[in-house]
Amino acid sequence: MIQKPRGTRDMLPDEMERRREIEARMRARARLYGFREIATPVFEELELFTIRSGEGIINEMYVFEDKGGRSLALRPELTAPVLRMYVEEGRSLNKPVKWCYFADCFRYERPQKGRYRQFWQFGAELIGADSAMGDAEVITLGYDLLRTAGVTFVLRIGHLSFMRTLLADLADGDKKKIRAFLDKREEEAAITYLRDIGRDDLCDPLIRLCGARTLEDVFAIIGEIPEAARVREMFAILDASGIPYEINPAIARGLDYYTGVVFECFAEGLGAENQILGGGAYRLAHLFGGEDTPSAGFAIGFDRVMVALGEASWVPWQPQVMIITTNEGRDYALTIAGQFRMNGIITETDLMDRSFSAQMKAAGKSADYAVIIGKDEVETGTITLKDLKAGTQEKITADEAIQKLTSA
């Protein structure tokens, strides 16, 4: 038997309905902030991702060569493709550009709870707004989307200038190592590395900075920095908006293109793989042939959102109807089915030439109502509507049934 590839999933109708409901909530919420949905190719030129994505992601990419000898990759993330699209298609648009997307991404990593090799992401990118207000809106949108989805989570915010200032006199390679440790939340490994390279003087400040939870504590450790006024303004805007958050200077992010504010959200009940959102401010457009354009955005791991929701996610109830008929009532039944569907009622008819009793038995397993059509219903232009849960039935017109079912 041929099975699905490791790290992928099949999703049956119940799961897909739950997912589509949460997606719809998130799409609608993003639209309220002025973000419009876009789509990019599933595969891109390999160079798009090797320019600035970070070693961890580069090593996990699905890479192939096409028949023309071009090196291509299945997208491991969406920010780089979106900025490539902006440079190629959207530079003439009014700023700021507000785009969002749902899309599959692909990474060759070890599958585990909430982590797959093919995974579904929601993301949003704000392009061309270089302000504390812009940074705050992106964070607020991310928070609002998860809240709307029904997830219980914690929002943590940092700024790369905090750690960049503390580690300013380290070699670039050493900075990268420290950032990689912090991104994996391995602070002890970062301390050990500093000792190994003879920088014991940075160990205590790093420990204190990683543990700082107020801006006052942060600036007491690193001193005032050029970004201080904007950082304070951004947090003041979040406070005014009523957004709950924790300050965490240790946030590093695994992608090499972030330049300023960074933020992450962590859900309850997911164990070690509990990060469901990550984002920040970045500059990428100039790497793809455009102008140096300030941007900010985030991605939500939608699969982890669904795991975090568990059975808490719900699909609005809609009555389901099965039409039960004899051969002489078939044409009339098809007309009724068409009328029901035109009015948004989920309606099925028998496709297996079953007997009347077998049709009723099947309806009892999958439907909420049975519409019974026999010789009498055809002659009188009516239907018999049976509530399969209550066991009651009544003979009414199709219009009356539609009114009853659409108001249920």
Swiss-Prot record:
Gene label: hisS
Class of enzymatic activity (EC top level): ligase
GO cellular component terms attached to this protein's record: cytoplasm
Annotated HAMAP family: His_tRNA_synth, HisZ
Signal peptide bounds: none
Alphabetic keyword roster: Aminoacyl-tRNA synthetase, ATP-binding, Cytoplasm, Ligase, Nucleotide-binding, Protein biosynthesis
NCBIfam families attached to this UniProt entry: hisS
Molecular functions (GO terms): ATP binding; histidine-tRNA ligase activity
Reaction catalysed by this enzyme: tRNA(His) + L-histidine + ATP = L-histidyl-tRNA(His) + AMP + diphosphate + H(+)
Name assigned to this protein: Histidine--tRNA ligase
Main location: cytoplasm
A Pfam family of this chain: HGTP_anticodon
CDD domains noted in UniProt: HisRS-like_core (cd00773), HisRS_anticodon (cd00859)
Compartments in which it is found: Cytoplasm
PANTHER family: HISTIDINE--TRNA LIGASE, MITOCHONDRIAL-RELATED, HISTIDYL-TRNA SYNTHETASE
Organism field: Methanospirillum hungatei JF-1 (strain ATCC 27890 / DSM 864 / NBRC 100397 / JF-1)
Assigned protein family: Belongs to the class-II aminoacyl-tRNA synthetase family.
EC number(s) given by UniProt: 6.1.1.21
Top-rank lineage group of the source organism: Archaea
UniProt-listed GO biological process terms: histidyl-tRNA aminoacylation; L-histidine biosynthetic process
